[in-house]
């Protein structure tokens, strides 16, 4: 007894759509090789290291001028003008007088210092960068420099603003 062979069926060819062109690779304009020094301040942040990074860009870039507040390349600031401008770039307001800046923020001990804290002296102020060092507007001869916290004077206080 033979059965009639089943009709051969071919699977239907899959429906195809025309191939979409491959997406073009995303390209971005090349970033400039050099950027202005110092770079603009980032948005306000609670990170003391961001304050240090911004402050360090001014080393050798701005002159010391007693009473100065012009923190620009080739401009002039004094110690409190420097700290006032650096913190202002992060939305923190300080007066232009080192004797008043010691009243801002929270008092901390030397052992508690973190990058971004103020180092306050009688008649002077700087920003702690870590490792027992600070950045500050030192003098007309030296400008904005990095020094040991105990470079010339005994600090009278340490303040945390962030």
Briefly describe each language-model feature range.
Residues 27, 47-48, 53-56, 92-108, ...:
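Aromatic- and glycine-rich peptidoglycan recognition patches
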Residues 124-126:
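A conserved glycine-rich beta-strand in the N-terminal activation segment of trypsin-fold
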């Amino acid at each position: 007894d033979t059965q009639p062979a089943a009709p051969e069926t071919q699977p239907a060819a899959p429906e195809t759509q025309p191939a979409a062109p491959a997406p073009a690779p995303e390209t971005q304009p090349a970033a400039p090789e050099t950027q202005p020094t110092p770079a603009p301040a980032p948005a306000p942040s609670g990170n003391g290291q961001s304050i240090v990074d911004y402050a360090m860009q001014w080393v050798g870039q701005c002159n010391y001028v007693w009473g100065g507040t012009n923190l620009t390349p080739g401009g002039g600031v004094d110690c409190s003008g420097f700290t006032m401008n650096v913190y202002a770039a992060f939305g923190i307001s300080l007066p232009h007088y080192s004797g008043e800046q010691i009243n801002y923020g929270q008092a901390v001990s030397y052992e508690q210092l973190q990058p971004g804290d103020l180092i306050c002296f009688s008649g002077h102020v700087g920003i702690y960068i870590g490792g027992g060092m600070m950045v500050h507007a030192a003098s007309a001869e030296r400008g904005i420099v990095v020094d040991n916290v105990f470079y010339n004077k005994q600090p009278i206080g340490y303040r945390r603003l962030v």
